[in-house]
Design a protein with these regions (language model features):
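Membrane-helix interface/capping segments
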Residues: 72-87
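N-terminal membrane-targeting/pre-transmembrane regions
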Residues: 1-49, 156
């Protein structure tokens, strides 16, 4: 089987209600202020800024900030390596080769108590990549360090890693 064969692909976006609210609440507030000041000509706030400042705020917080928040995603693929990329914070994916894996297993974890929340979390010895949820695959390396890859389909990810390393030396932990 070619290393280019894709055993697994998952793209997870941050789409929880509180996250969408975080993206849209400042945008809505800026839209309201921009309409008041730029369209109706009524200065917005107790100490209003110039129209140029209002245009700047509209572009940055009304358009760019929500677009940025809504494009954050985590892509996980399994080909000849396990690849995890948390866009836009990682320019290149983290690649885990089949020979780097000592053990791996499907786990249920607490993102907040185990890793301090969602995103790229943990320490250099125990890293987690997760978007939401509380399930994933934990991979252990020879030096004892671990990486947890959060997934909405952890059993499929586990099966894909198994298929990837069929000819390798990793040990499966059920």
């Amino acid at each position: 089987m070619s290393d280019d064969y894709e055993h697994f692909r998952e793209v997870q976006y941050l789409r929880t209600w509180w996250y969408v609210l975080l993206a849209l609440l400042p945008a809505g507030l800026i839209y309201w202020g921009a309409i008041q000041q730029l369209y109706f000509g009524e200065p917005w706030g107790n100490n209003p800024g110039s129209d140029g400042l209002m245009w700047f705020l509209l572009v940055v917080f009304g358009i760019l900030f929500p677009l940025f928040l809504l494009t954050i995603n985590m892509r996980t693929t399994v080909t000849g390596t396990v690849n995890v990329r948390f866009f836009p914070f990682m320019s290149k994916p983290r690649r885990i080769g089949r020979n780097d894996i000592v053990t791996y297993s499907v786990v249920t974890y607490s993102p907040i108590t185990d890793y301090g929340g969602w995103g790229i979390k943990g320490t250099s010895m125990h890293r987690a990549y997760n978007v939401y949820g509380k399930r994933g695959v934990r991979i252990t390396f020879a030096n004892g360090s671990t990486v947890l890859i959060g997934s909405q389909r952890p059993e499929e990810l586990y099966t894909a890693i198994t298929a990837m390393i069929r000819t390798g030396t990793a040990r499966v932990v059920l």
